[in-house]
Amino acid sequence: MLPAKFKTPSQKSLNRRMASIPDGLVRRCPVCHTTFLTDHWEPTRLCPACGYGFRLTAMQRIKLTMDTFQETNAQLTVPDRYTDAAYQAKVARGRQLTGLNESVLTGFGTIDHQSTAIGVMDAFFVMGSLGTATGEKITRLFDEATAKRLPVILFTASGGARMQEGIHSLMQMAKVSAAVARHSQAGLLYIVVLCDPTTGGVTASFAMQGDLILAEPHALVGFAGRRVIEQTIHQTPPADFQRAETVLQHGFIDAIVARPQLKQRLADLLRLHKGES
């Protein structure tokens, strides 16, 4: 019998090796299913094969987009009347992950010397859901932008209305829509950027009310979830169902812009609206 050249490692040795591998070193794209190393993917966090943009926190998005930024209404958070322990745990987890008090970051700043109001919904905070304070922050953003005669850019990323807050959450759809209307009646520009995912009550209201509606490549955009639709119509939708490319083909959005080009495209659109070349 030949002597063994290789020795089977012990479980203890394997555990030590696993512990030395950093978290997030390898990712798998949910769109094209490519597996890749993440050593060079910051700050844009794109799939190298298909260009799908992995989810960003609101602050990461601000750093990619804005040259200057001043946050507003940072203190607004979930009202005290919602005392459910499981819900409070989700909110606490969202605060830990994002550093925010709610699922949207709002403020004012500049993009390539163009002044604008900006809001960024954060999918890492209770799935970017539309809660009472979320709606209040976005409403204040639009009203403050109207008073200052500034455009609004809103990045949407949301699972929809926050069911834990019931009718108060649903009311935010109408409340924000009214603020959008006041801003529009003042002749001001509203640009929406649909990020992955934009669904539910957010899609059914202010996400589709922009003067210009952009989307990131392969972003999930829809109202009801795929599983709910399959159970309702008893059919299997196509693989690209509710992806930004399909939504563009059906005329619901104006353009798909890759993440590396998005900042310059927004700056160009702001200039065009001001009548600058």
Swiss-Prot record:
The enzyme's E.C. designation: 2.1.3.15
Catalytic activity: N(6)-carboxybiotinyl-L-lysyl-[protein] + acetyl-CoA = N(6)-biotinyl-L-lysyl-[protein] + malonyl-CoA
Binding positions (Zn(2+)): C29, C32, C47, C50
Molecular function via GO: acetyl-CoA carboxylase activity; ATP binding; carboxyl- or carbamoyltransferase activity; zinc ion binding
InterPro entries found in the cross-reference section: AcCoA_carboxyl_beta, Acetyl_CoA_COase_Trfase_b_su, ClpP/crotonase-like_dom_sf, COA_CT_N
An example Gene Ontology biological process: malonyl-CoA biosynthetic process
Record-linked PROSITE patterns: COA_CT_NTER
Cofactors named for this entry: Zn(2+)
Pfam families: Carboxyl_trans
Span of domain CoA carboxyltransferase N-terminal: 25-277
Cofactor annotation remark: Binds 1 zinc ion per subunit.
UniProt keyword annotations, A-Z: ATP-binding, Cytoplasm, Fatty acid biosynthesis, Fatty acid metabolism, Lipid biosynthesis, Lipid metabolism, Metal-binding, Nucleotide-binding, Transferase, Zinc, Zinc-finger
Cell compartments where the protein resides: Cytoplasm
Keyword set includes RNA-binding: no
ZnF locations on chain (C4-type): 29-50
UniProt pathway: Lipid metabolism; malonyl-CoA biosynthesis; malonyl-CoA from acetyl-CoA: step 1/1
Lineage top rank: taxon: Bacteria
Enzyme class, broadest EC rank: transferase
Entry GO CC: acetyl-CoA carboxylase complex
Summary of the function given for this chain in its UniProt record: Component of the acetyl coenzyme A carboxylase (ACC) complex. Biotin carboxylase (BC) catalyzes the carboxylation of biotin on its carrier protein (BCCP) and then the CO(2) group is transferred by the transcarboxylase to acetyl-CoA to form malonyl-CoA.
Similarity remark: Belongs to the AccD/PCCB family.
Subunit structure: Acetyl-CoA carboxylase is a heterohexamer composed of biotin carboxyl carrier protein (AccB), biotin carboxylase (AccC) and two subunits each of ACCase subunit alpha (AccA) and ACCase subunit beta (AccD).
Protein name: Acetyl-coenzyme A carboxylase carboxyl transferase subunit beta
Originating organism: Levilactobacillus brevis (strain ATCC 367 / BCRC 12310 / CIP 105137 / JCM 1170 / LMG 11437 / NCIMB 947 / NCTC 947)
Gene that this sequence comes from: accD
